[in-house]
């Protein structure tokens, strides 16, 4: 492929992906899910001069417990820092739209990197020029239109950005590894430094960057050939017995340690900040995340996750929990949203996973999937693997299109076709995924409109009821949405008994509780019983603008407000 053709192909893929993501972003008018609001809200606070601050205290597992509080006790800051750049230019009036600029650009770049990965795989498989070109461009086109990649290219969180960094790191790993076996005496330090920069920036985006680093370590230590061109008897004997000569060991150490040092150096300032702010250089509640027994444990206040509570479930419950986490990551993240490409890609992955061009991505994908499924089986059901799975979906696209290309070539030989029809594979894939993409974007657009309508109507309704927002922090089941829409301090509602919530309210001086009736949480239904402290929650009826009761069409019909009043 000529340089001109490569630039034209990359430009065409980027343009297609950009248009699709811009349309999707325009359809989403409010940050959903809540973590999206967190990233965009912190970016707004940075632009307004408040620094890395959040008005929502959504987790009680990291000290100090204050509200507003320093942001990113669990997540990483880079998505917010980048979102602050267009926000600083455009202003904070349209803070969410400004934040979407970064996600649209990052999501479009994912498609270009997918094209490059497909082209590398095609070159390694030694496909004819026409089929190779089709596989590369087809991979980029499918990545431009695949529902999950489109959706998270419209939402300013960590997903699209981490996918860009993961794919870039894996592409660079394959190039460094290929040079190790090409006869060159040493890999230039600039490539190793660049890899370290990518790993460090990825670590500032998501904690799953560690699995990228381990994938590179595995490639360096076990996957690289001994230095090409060394045909001495000593080298041949060492190669037969799996022994690394001293010079080889030194080179492998350099390949591993230079990127690791650069990545650690880039992460060091953030680690120091966390140490000074939260008392730990790394996310302090990671261990507790592994001990969750319920999706609501992230909001636990008095009943914190513990090893004793985790083991007390018994073997059957633990097996069921891990099966649920595995099933969520497999079905809800990889197969169903990307159907049928996700399913086909998984089935044919053994056909391509030995390709050196895909090896780093395969290793990182397997490590990420295994750790999130086995160690964080409950936390992953809230998005741990999902937000790190962008690059994994690209891997499945390449595997699926490579299999379709082989199938079409085989059918062509059997049917004696004379015209090239490799384009049928990407065409079939696009025809299959576009309807689901439209449905996915439409669904999240409706959700965003519903959530925005609810939080736009809530302040006026509470003012009419005589309990205006702003008098101290508010306890609520969606603390980030309320904090960012009403610009007030909020506290996450623990899924615990009323007396525990009373302790929380007394500690922070909260006088109001706002909760949605969703049939999933025990709140507010728990107040209908005789639980200790239930009588301290006095419901405040909400009315419409005319003073009448809320009808079924009101965005607040499922919203309940309580005044916390206890002697």
Segments the model singles out, each with a brief description of its role:
Residues 11-18, 137, 143, 199, ...:
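Transmembrane alpha-helix segments characteristic
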Residues 18, 139-144, 191-206, 213-218, ...:
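Membrane-interface alpha helices of multi-pass inner-membrane proteins
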Residues 34, 98-106, 138-173, 201-213, ...:
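Multi-pass, polyprenyl lipid-linked donor-dependent membrane glycosyltransferases
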């Amino acid at each position: 492929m000529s340089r001109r053709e490569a630039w034209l192909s990359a430009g065409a893929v980027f343009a297609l992906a950009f248009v699709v993501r811009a349309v999707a972003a325009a359809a989403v008018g409010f940050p959903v899910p809540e973590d999206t609001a967190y990233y965009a809200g912190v970016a707004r606070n940075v632009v307004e001069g408040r620094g890395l601050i959040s008005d929502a205290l959504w987790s009680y597992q990291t000290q100090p417990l204050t509200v507003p509080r320093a942001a990113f006790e669990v997540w990483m800051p880079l998505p917010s820092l980048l979102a602050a750049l267009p926000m600083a230019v455009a202003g904070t009036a349209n803070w969410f739209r400004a934040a979407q600029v970064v996600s649209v650009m990052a999501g479009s770049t994912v498609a270009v990197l997918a094209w490059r990965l497909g082209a590398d795989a095609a070159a390694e498989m030694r496909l004819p020029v026409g089929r190779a070109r089709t596989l590369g461009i087809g991979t980029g086109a499918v990545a431009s239109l695949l529902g999950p990649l489109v959706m998270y290219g419209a939402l300013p969180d960590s997903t699209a950005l981490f996918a860009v960094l993961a794919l870039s790191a894996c592409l660079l790993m394959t190039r460094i590894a290929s040079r190790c076996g090409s006869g060159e005496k040493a890999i230039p330090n600039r490539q190793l430094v660049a890899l370290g920069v990518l790993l460090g920036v990825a670590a500032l985006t998501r904690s799953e960057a560690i699995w990228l680093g381990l994938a590179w370590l595995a490639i360096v230590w076990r996957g690289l050939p001994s230095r090409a061109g060394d045909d001495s008897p000593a080298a041949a004997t060492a190669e037969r017995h799996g022994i690394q000569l001293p010079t080889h060991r030194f080179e492998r150490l350099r390949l591993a340690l230079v990127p690791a040092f650069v990545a650690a150096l880039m992460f060091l300032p953030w680690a120091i900040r966390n140490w000074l702010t939260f008392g730990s250089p790394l996310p302090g509640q990671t261990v507790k995340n592994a001990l969750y027994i319920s999706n609501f444990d992230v909001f636990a206040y008095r009943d914190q996750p513990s090893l004793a509570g985790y083991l007390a479930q018994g073997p059957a419950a633990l097996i069921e929990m891990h099966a649920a986490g595995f099933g969520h990551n497999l079905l809800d993240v990889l197969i169903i949203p990307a159907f049928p490409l996700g399913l086909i890609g998984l089935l044919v992955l053994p056909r391509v996973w030995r390709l050196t061009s895909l090896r780093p991505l395969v290793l990182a994908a397997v490590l990420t999937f295994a750790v999130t499924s086995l160690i964080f089986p409950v936390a992953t059901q809230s998005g741990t693997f999902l937000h790190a799975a962008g690059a994994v979906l690209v891997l499945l696209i390449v595997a699926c299109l490579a299999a379709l290309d082989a199938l079409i070539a085989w059918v062509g030989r059997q049917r004696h076709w004379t015209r090239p029809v490799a384009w049928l594979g990407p065409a079939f894939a696009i025809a299959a995924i576009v309807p689901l993409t439209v449905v996915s974007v439409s669904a999240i657009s409706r959700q965003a409109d519903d959530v925005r309508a609810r939080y736009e109507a809530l302040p006026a309704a509470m003012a009419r009821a005589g309990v205006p927002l702003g008098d101290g922090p508010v306890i609520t089941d969606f603390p980030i949405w309320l904090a960012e829409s009403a610009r007030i301090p909020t506290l996450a509602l623990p899924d615990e008994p009323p007396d525990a919530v009373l302790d929380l309210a007394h500690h922070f001086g909260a006088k109001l509780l706002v909760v949605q009736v969703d049939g999933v949480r025990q709140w507010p239904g728990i107040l209908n019983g005789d639980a200790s402290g239930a009588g301290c929650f006095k419901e405040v009826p909400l009315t419409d603008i005319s003073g009448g009761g809320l009808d079924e069409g009101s965005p607040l019909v499922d919203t309940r407000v309580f005044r916390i009043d206890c002697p």
